[in-house]
């Protein structure tokens, strides 16, 4: 097989895998509700605003629990706050 053809096939495979990975990332994100328009009935607007409020709460909620990535895990281990060594606060340094 031609070396140039191998290079193009490898680039095509990498691009395909990149699109697959990006597709899986976007599937996990909630979709914004559709706006019914300005002349929609009050019931439709109430449903839309309720769905919009729910959407905003989903994308801005605090995430608690074991959702740490490897980077935050390493930084927590190196400079993290523990019971024996509490993290210093900026305000404590200005207590003069």
From Swiss-Prot:
Residues 1-28 form the signal peptide. It holds the Pfam family Hormone_3. One of its GO terms (molecular function) is neuropeptide Y receptor binding. GO terms for cellular component: extracellular space. Keywords: Amidation, Cleavage on pair of basic residues, Neuropeptide, Secreted, Signal. CDD domains: PAH. NPY is implicated in the control of feeding and in secretion of gonadotrophin-release hormone. This is Pro-neuropeptide Y. It comes from Danio rerio (Zebrafish).
